[in-house]
């Protein structure tokens, strides 16, 4: 079962005629977490329900956990732990849940030098925004300048590997113009995840679309067969 909580989401999956894509993506992440070391620490879980409202059946929904900082959800340092005096202390002691989404619909947000949007999902202040922005931009600068080892010291690579594997297996094209791509900073490290929003632009049915647009998946699987590169540890 799922941990007790008062906040839940009813996903309509209205863009997905199979109603299954979100559940499949979350299921793949569960397999990774249960069989591999490291990786994404938490992703939403849920179950399908038939919703009846005022005696009227209104359809099939996916009842699942909401993405939020919480001991029974994403368990990272919560700026609101001190209810009477929140957001006190140095910015680096807080956990930051972020979403890369070109909808820019949060109050606290920033963009990297390469135009990747990051939206803070919780209320913040100017010092917290400055810290999160500096941390993420610092990693991006290191990667683009070829200082990979230094950048990797600030990243949980296993979570990024698992996150990207799920995106590739689901053939999610929305990473190109990011929608609902979550990440977070906690205790001086940046993590990928949790997963969200796979009911649109995933597992395309067009043969031409899949063959022409996902050559990386083919090369990734070839790496697995040859036991070369980073993929060998995940075979």
Regions found by a protein language model. Give the residues of each.
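Extracellular structured ligand-interaction cores
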Residues: 5-7, 44-48, 57-61, 93-97, ...
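Active-site-proximal structural scaffolding
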Residues: 3, 18-22, 42-44, 125, ...
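Active-site acidic catalytic loop and adjacent metal/ATP-binding pocket
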Residues: 154-205
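Solvent-exposed loop/turn segments at secondary-structure junctions
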Residues: 15-18, 56-58, 66-70, 103-105, ...
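A conserved hydrophobic secondary-structure block that centers on an alpha-helix together
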Residues: 2-60, 138-159
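A generic secondary-structure signal for well-formed alpha-helical elements
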Residues: 28-37, 53, 66-71, 75, ...
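ATP-dependent phospho-/nucleotidyl transfer catalytic cores
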Residues: 13, 63, 69-170, 220
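C-terminal catalytic region of ATP-dependent kinase domains
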Residues: 124-126, 133, 187-235
């Amino acid at each position: 079962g799922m941990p007790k909580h008062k906040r839940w989401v009813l996903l309509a999956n209205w863009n997905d005629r199979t109603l299954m894509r979100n559940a499949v993506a979350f299921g793949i992440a569960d397999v990774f977490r249960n069989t591999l070391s490291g990786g994404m620490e938490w992703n939403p879980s849920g179950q399908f329900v038939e919703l009846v409202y005022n005696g009227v059946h209104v359809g099939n929904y996916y009842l699942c956990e909401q993405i939020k900082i919480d001991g029974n959800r994403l368990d990272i340092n919560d700026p609101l732990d001190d209810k009477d005096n929140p957001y006190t202390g140095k910015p680096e002691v807080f956990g930051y849940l972020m979403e890369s989404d070109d909808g820019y619909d949060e109050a606290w947000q920033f963009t990297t030098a390469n135009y990747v949007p990051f939206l803070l999902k919780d209320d913040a202040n100017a010092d917290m925004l400055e810290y999160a922005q500096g941390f993420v931009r610092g990693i991006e600068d290191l990667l683009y300048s070829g200082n990979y080892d230094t950048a990797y010291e600030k990243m949980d690579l296993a979570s990024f590997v698992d996150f990207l594997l799920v995106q590739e297996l689901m053939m999610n094209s929305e990473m190109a113009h990011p929608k609902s791509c979550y990440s977070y900073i906690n205790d001086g490290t940046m993590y990928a995840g949790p997963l969200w929003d796979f009911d649109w632009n995933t597992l395309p049915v067009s043969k031409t679309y899949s063959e022409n647009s996902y050559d990386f998946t083919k090369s990734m699987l070839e790496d697995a067969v040859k036991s070369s590169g980073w993929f060998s540890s995940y075979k």
